[in-house]
């Protein structure tokens, strides 16, 4: 027992000496490093850094405080000391401490840049946020209601309903068939005889100051064909029939027309021939050439083709 007690006393004394030696050595090493950092900090940091350098310089009275703080770490804290294996050198320590200080002061500047950029980005996001937030609210509100869906379908139905009448109301291209009755010689037609013959053949003076052939001989009903002045201005307007004269009149009908187009054409041709016979004139085609059987066949063929194209 006495031997064991002696061994424990020796081991405890050695441990205490080792801790004291370790504390003295580390305090001297830090004192040299802080002393070497002082000139470099004045060159690099200017007037604002002496405060920090003064903080690093500790008086001799503080060594006891440092020694007391160094007694607290356990044996695991000795790993950095054992792994370094390098005795402190003031020149090397000055370089490392200078680099550390540069890194310490460079990082806050970089962080400041980041914070400025983040602040600007946050400000831009705050400015843009209301525009992007309000629009979805306006769009989402109608989408949540079912009547909008009904309106969409009803809109499509109205489009279909509009397309059908348009397809039904598309009219074929208007065509005009023209016949002319021209005086045989140099003597023009006199209004008295001309108007009397026209009235006897069922023509009635009416709209646009020209004569019309209606479905009813009394001048009522749909217009089948019309008769105008062959000469300028084209009207048959007159105050005194005896003072009116013209070298010819023009019969015309349109395609499509009311009733049967071929029957209307035959009636128009028959009326033109009667008036030409009454006045001693000639029946001409649309180009003011004498009417021929071939040209009459061309008129009838035009009517048949028009009916077939619009059947």
UniProtKB/Swiss-Prot annotation:
SUPFAM superfamilies with a match to the protein in the record: Cell-division protein ZipA, C-terminal domain
Could you tell me where this protein is found in the cell? Cell inner membrane
Q: Which Gene3D superfamilies match?
A: ZipA, C-terminal FtsZ-binding domain
Q: Which UniProt keywords apply?
A: Cell cycle, Cell division, Cell inner membrane, Cell membrane, Membrane, Transmembrane, Transmembrane helix
Q: Which domain of life is it from?
A: Bacteria
Q: Which GO terms describe its cellular component?
A: cell division site; plasma membrane
Positions of region (Disordered): 32-60
Q: Which SMART domains match?
A: ZipA_C
Ranges of the Periplasmic topological domain: 1-5
Main location class: membrane
Q: Which residues cross the membrane?
A: 6-26
Pfam families (UniProt xref)? ZipA_C
Its BP terms in the Gene Ontology are: division septum assembly; FtsZ-dependent cytokinesis
**Cross-referenced InterPro entries:** Cell_div_ZipA, ZipA_FtsZ-bd_C, ZipA_FtsZ-bd_C_sf
Q: Which residue stretches does the UniProt record annotate as biased composition, category Basic and acidic residues?
A: 32-54
Membrane topology according to the record: Single-pass type I membrane protein
- Which stretches face the Cytoplasmic side? 27-311
Q: How does it assemble?
A: Interacts with FtsZ via their C-terminal domains.
Which HAMAP family does its entry note? ZipA
Q: Which family does it belong to?
A: Belongs to the ZipA family.
User: What role is this protein assigned?
Assistant: Essential cell division protein that stabilizes the FtsZ protofilaments by cross-linking them and that serves as a cytoplasmic membrane anchor for the Z ring. Also required for the recruitment to the septal ring of downstream cell division proteins.
Q: How is this protein named in the record? A: Cell division protein ZipA
